[in-house]
Amino acid sequence: MKKTLIIGVTGGSASGKTSVSHAILETFSNERIAMIEHDSYYKDQSHLTFEERTKTNYDHPLAFDTDYLIAQLKELQYGRAVDIPIYDYAKHTRSQETYRQEPVDVLIVEGILVLEDERLRDLMDIKIFVDTDDDVRIIRRIRRDIEERGRTLDSVITQYLDAVKPMYHQFIEPTKRYADVIIPEGVSNTVGVDIITTKIASILND
C-alpha cells in the first residue's frame, strides 16, 4: 500500500495557513487529498463552566490533545478511516459531533503548533511555515473571530495580548527552524506556493 504523504502547514494565528492549505488542495483536486485541522483536537472542556473555558490558553501546546491527533494520523496511514472531532468555537469545547475521514494519498495537517511536537513532525514528509507580519495577523484575527466565531472586539484583543502574542513568540515562531520551506506573506506568495506544489507533484509521481 502506498504511504500517505503528510504535509504540515503552520504559522501564527491568521497568518494564512488555511489559505495556503486550500491552494494545495485545489492544485491536487484530482488526487485523494484532505486536510485535518489541529484545532479540531482542542481538549474537551465540557466538564468546565463556560467562564472557565473562556480563560483557557488556546495557544499553548497543553490545550491540544495531540496524542489523539497522532493516533488518528497513524490509523489513516494504515488505511483505516477515523472519526475526526469537531470543535465548537462559540461554546469553547468539543462538539458531540464528528466527521468521517477516509484514508487518502495526501493529507494536510494544519495548525499553529503542528511542528511543536517532535512525534508529529516525524510523521510529516513536508513541513511548511507561513510567515506573516504580526500587524497583518492581528487585523485578520479580529475580523475573523468577530465575523465567523461570534466573538466581541474586546475579547479578541484581550486574548491576543494575554495569550496569542506571547505564545506565538514562545512556542510557534521557534518551530520555524523545523520547516522545510518558509513562505512569507502566505498564499499571495505565488512563487513559494508553486515551489511546494511542484515538490508534492514530484513525490506523487515517483
Curated annotation (Swiss-Prot):
<dbReference type="GO" id="GO:0005524">
    <property type="term" value="F:ATP binding"/>
</dbReference>
<dbReference type="GO" id="GO:0044211">
    <property type="term" value="P:CTP salvage"/>
</dbReference>
<keyword id="KW-0963">Cytoplasm</keyword>
<comment type="similarity">
    <text>Belongs to the uridine kinase family.</text>
</comment>
<comment type="pathway">
    <text>Pyrimidine metabolism; UMP biosynthesis via salvage pathway; UMP from uridine: step 1/1.</text>
</comment>
<protein>
    <recommendedName>
        <fullName>Uridine kinase</fullName>
        <ecNumber>2.7.1.48</ecNumber>
    </recommendedName>
</protein>
<dbReference type="GO" id="GO:0005737">
    <property type="term" value="C:cytoplasm"/>
</dbReference>
<comment type="pathway">
    <text>Pyrimidine metabolism; CTP biosynthesis via salvage pathway; CTP from cytidine: step 1/3.</text>
</comment>
<keyword id="KW-0808">Transferase</keyword>
<dbReference type="GO" id="GO:0004849">
    <property type="term" value="F:uridine kinase activity"/>
</dbReference>
<feature type="binding site">
    <location>
        <begin position="11"/>
        <end position="18"/>
    </location>
    <ligand>
        <name>ATP</name>
    </ligand>
</feature>
<dbReference type="GO" id="GO:0043771">
    <property type="term" value="F:cytidine kinase activity"/>
</dbReference>
<dbReference type="GO" id="GO:0044206">
    <property type="term" value="P:UMP salvage"/>
</dbReference>
<dbReference type="InterPro" id="IPR006083">
    <property type="entry name" value="PRK/URK"/>
</dbReference>
<dbReference type="InterPro" id="IPR027417">
    <property type="entry name" value="P-loop_NTPase"/>
</dbReference>
<keyword id="KW-0067">ATP-binding</keyword>
<dbReference type="InterPro" id="IPR026008">
    <property type="entry name" value="Uridine_kinase"/>
</dbReference>
<keyword id="KW-0418">Kinase</keyword>
<dbReference type="InterPro" id="IPR000764">
    <property type="entry name" value="Uridine_kinase-like"/>
</dbReference>
<keyword id="KW-0547">Nucleotide-binding</keyword>
<dbReference type="Pfam" id="PF00485">
    <property type="entry name" value="PRK"/>
</dbReference>
